[in-house]
Amino acid sequence: MQERKITISNRLGLHARAAAQLVRRASQFTSSVHLIREDTGDEADGKSILSVLLLAAPCGTCLIIKTDGEDDARAISALAELVEHKFGEEISDGVF
């Protein structure tokens, strides 16, 4: 089992497109993926778009990613990288 704390830092937060990217990436791994919103304790299945969207995580929200399974280390690294790179939405000057 792996666990990592991340902060949503893209301007629009975890909106539909970003959530879809996260779910697609999570679905590439056999490990289970759960996202927990640190401030509310709300938990989402990282492989369910509806579940992820229901977190309603704006910019600045701290999430805990938990993965469990044979490829959990690779899964958590891939998901953290996606979030850290702001889902590929923003270029260096902060404009889409």
Language-model-detected regions and their locations in the chain:
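N-terminal loops that bind phosphate or other acidic moieties
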Residues: 3-4, 8, 95-96
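Compact, glycine-rich, soluble single-domain proteins
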Residues: 7-59
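C-terminal structural segments of small proteins and small subunits
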Residues: 58-96
